[in-house]
Amino acid sequence: MTSIVFMGTPQFSVPILEALVANDYQILAVVTQPDRKVGRKQVLQQTPVKEAAVRLDLPVFQPEKLSGSPELADVIALQPDLIVTAAYGQFLPTKLLEAAKIAAINVHGSLLPKYRGGAPIQYAVLNGDSEIGITIMHMAKKMDAGDMIEQASIPIEATDDTGSLFDKLSYVGRDLLLKTLPGIIAQTAPRTPQDEVQVTFAYNITKEQEQLDINQPAEQLLNQIRALRPQPGAWLAVNGQRTKIWQATVAETTTDQAAGVVVALNKKDFELAAGNGTVLKITEIQPAGKAKMPVQSYLNGVGKQLAVGQQVVVQDAE
């Protein structure tokens, strides 16, 4: 039986771990991020991978920082045949990668060499890509730079956002890993070096990237909204108030109004002029300090003071 140390953190990783157990791979340990306090009540929450590991009765390690930790030595001492990572969230020390008797493998959420880094799915949506995929790859000291074993792709639908693609890709990754593992174990699987000329990066989303720039075309704004959903959410400064935009469409109409001006307003419509004469039609919104709401509820409450022709969006508000 092939022994594995599995490393992962979010829900994306859970179907992969469950499949390894179901297919009789020996999971020596699961390494995941520490429990974190979340929400206003600061409730201590386990990672989805820890919850799955506990349910599957697997040993769990949760170092705050893996490098130099006592847990690192414990994991290395397990001498696994394979290390399998899927969205773990920390760099792996070289001596850990070298501890795998056969290979250290990563399930990466992009079609490498495109989108190395921690936010490949977000960037694929942000950039309006037509497809996304999974790469099964060997791990290397350099971030996401190892040789590729196999890839699988799926289309990005207009209705997709980062959340839906995370869900879809977790199963694509699961199936592709199960398909490639026999060849990896037999050491007959292909190894294709990445073309460094084609490399792009998808670093973690910054706070600055959460703000929508109303001077951008509506299609780009919509991509940003989808890329930042379900969290952390994209926002506009509406009358100086940070207002999250959760659902929107690109209106069929165009306008000669300046970006940030209200161009349509009634019980069901809240349309803003965006860049290049385009119009963003907002359908779900979250004013500061409030819950998400349909735009109808917003216009009956907080948004009552808005008027057609009014410049309501100001950049760089806090």
Swiss-Prot record:
GO molecular function: methionyl-tRNA formyltransferase activity
SUPFAM superfamilies membership: FMT C-terminal domain-like, Formyltransferase
Keyword DNA repair in annotation: no
Entry binding sites for (6S)-5,6,7,8-tetrahydrofolate: 110-113
Signal peptide range: none
Gene3D superfamilies, A to Z: Formyl transferase, C-terminal domain, Formyl transferase, N-terminal domain
One Gene Ontology term, aspect cellular component: cytosol
EC number: 2.1.2.9
Keyword line: Protein biosynthesis, Transferase
Keyword Protein biosynthesis included in the entry's annotation: yes
Domain of life: Bacteria
SS bond list: none
Pfam assignment, any one: Formyl_trans_C
Enzymatic reactions: L-methionyl-tRNA(fMet) + (6R)-10-formyltetrahydrofolate = N-formyl-L-methionyl-tRNA(fMet) + (6S)-5,6,7,8-tetrahydrofolate + H(+)
Top-level class of the enzyme under EC nomenclature: transferase
InterPro entries per UniProt: Fmt, Formyl_trans_C, Formyl_trans_C_sf, Formyl_transf_N, Formyl_transf_N_sf, Formyl_transferase-like_C_sf, Met-tRNA-FMT_C, Met-tRNA-FMT_N
Family: Belongs to the Fmt family.
Entry-linked HAMAP family: Formyl_trans
Matching PANTHER family: METHIONYL-TRNA FORMYLTRANSFERASE, METHIONYL-TRNA FORMYLTRANSFERASE, MITOCHONDRIAL
Role played: Attaches a formyl group to the free amino group of methionyl-tRNA(fMet). The formyl group appears to play a dual role in the initiator identity of N-formylmethionyl-tRNA by promoting its recognition by IF2 and preventing the misappropriation of this tRNA by the elongation apparatus.
Protein name according to UniProt: Methionyl-tRNA formyltransferase
Record organism: Latilactobacillus sakei subsp. sakei (strain 23K)
